[in-house]
Amino acid sequence: MAKILSFSDDARHQLEHGVNALADAVKVTLGPRGRNVVLDKKFGAPTITNDGVTIAKEIELTDPHENLGAQLVKEVATKTNDVAGDGTTTATVLAQALVREGLRNVAAGANPTGLKRGIDAAATKVSEALLGKAVEVSDKAAIAHVATVSAQDSTIGELIAEAMERVGRDGVITVEEGSTLATELDVTEGLQFDKGFISPNFVTDAEGQESVLEDPYILITTQKISAIEELLPLLEKVLQDSKPLLIIAEDVEGQALSTLVVNALRKTMKVCAVKAPGFGDRRKAMLQDMAILTGAELVAPELGYKLDQVGLEVLGTARRVVVDKETTTVVDGGGQAADAADRVAQIRKEIEASDSEWDREKLAERLAKLSGGVAVIRAGAATEVEMKERKHRIEDAIAATKAAVEEGTIPGGGAALAQVLPALDDDLGLDGDEKVGVSIVRKALVEPLRWIAQNAGHDGYVVVQKVVDKDWGHGLDAATGEYVDLAKAGILDPVKVTRNAVANAASIAGLLLTTESLVVDKPQEPEPAAGGHGHGHQHGPGF
């Protein structure tokens, strides 16, 4: 396919137009008084959102050169969202300001490579300075503040704080569409996996259609159990203790399943069999996790265990097990806390070492099950459009809260970036174009504050000057229009979010400034309509 080429200033200005188009659509959403953006959908109701990355992902420009610029800024928003889960609009505003100031200096004769080095050095220094100013987030009230600021809703903030308190910092908090007007929290305490009973004859609670086992023994094996002879020695020992038994195996079938069902129906013993979750190596790892949580030994031939030769010593325990047709929930497993902590540390290392997004996601799920369960926030609203918008806000707030717990918080409202400017006072000892690069970052850092003020109906430049002159942590509460101690007012940002926004904006701006040519596909000319012979009759059936 034929290509169109653009070079030097022409290329960079076309990229800048694309950057501005996307950034102008996104930055109106910044701050508590930010506007919404309506996104058209091919199917269903339009989406109303103020989430930067959601808006950015929808934007494709018709001009291929400008579209490259838009896609570069989209990358800033997406990467910031992936790493920190929030701060996408801040990153976009910073990138636009860095590109604008950078191109102005390139046009005046500055060397793009020198500017890039200065920008990168300044971004690193700002990141270090912000981290040094961060305050640890530990108590529930501080967590609720961070979540409230991100979601712009105190009810959502309280729910997220409650969820995090109950499932722990590594616990999974998911968001679903609710079926009522209220937004609700539901927490699964303990371990839950997506496999239910193999036979409905194991049900002990006919009304709830559940098998409920109180203080049971738990057998966990990688084997498929077909012959009852394999299980008989163990079943007899369990029966002597008059305890229920949960069997988690690759499968239970044939004679073994029939015998278990007969014993359950006759109430000779309370028993329930479920299939192990997952596949292959992941299944084995998940079974090992369950064994650690319940204090069981994983019965597997490769570990030296044969099912017909083991006793009660390989069985785990729990306070309660509830099994329905789709899920199994183990509450208060009898494993040692130290063993679980070691396993958690091992999985964390695996997450850090993995370069596969899918593997990391699955490892994170295992980590959550080991470290505290799963919380589900159900977003309630009057209409589908409102529900989707609320769901987006809750997801952003969860990500921001987890980032805050991880690295701490700094004053929000754009004030921290404006007040960290003294870190760049000596231009980092650089000179020439690198020094200019530092000054470009200095000008860009106040832009998020300016747009937060602008969107709230204030003069952005006046607000910036006032905030820069104030002590650290004092700034504009855009929701009320007053200048306050931001930490006391609960206006906080996760430092991880802000640091990533700066780093990603600097990275993309540097790449764009050092771009010397663009290569895009030449648009295809529309083919002329084919001429016909003019007869109006149809050939064949008229489908």
Curated annotation (Swiss-Prot):
Cellular localisation: Cytoplasm
Bias kind Basic residues: ranges: 534-543
Descriptive protein name: Chaperonin GroEL 2
Single annotated GO MF: ATP-dependent protein folding chaperone
Enzymatic reactions: ATP + H2O + a folded polypeptide = ADP + phosphate + an unfolded polypeptide
GO aspect biological process, one term: protein refolding
Lineage top rank: taxon: Bacteria
Role according to the record: Together with its co-chaperonin GroES, plays an essential role in assisting protein folding. The GroEL-GroES system forms a nano-cage that allows encapsulation of the non-native substrate proteins and provides a physical environment optimized to promote and accelerate protein folding.
GO-annotated cellular components: cytoplasm
InterPro entries: Chaperonin_Cpn60_CS, Cpn60/GroEL, Cpn60/GroEL/TCP-1, GroEL-like_apical_dom_sf, GROEL-like_equatorial_sf, TCP-1-like_intermed_sf
Residue span of region Disordered: 523-543
Keyword annotations of the record: ATP-binding, Chaperone, Cytoplasm, Isomerase, Nucleotide-binding
EC number: 5.6.1.7
Subunit structure: Forms a cylinder of 14 subunits composed of two heptameric rings stacked back-to-back. Interacts with the co-chaperonin GroES.
Family: Belongs to the chaperonin (HSP60) family.
Binding residues for ATP: T29, L30, G31, P32, D86, G87, T88, T89, T90, G413, D477, A478, A479, D493
UniProt cross-references to CDD domains, sorted A to Z: GroEL
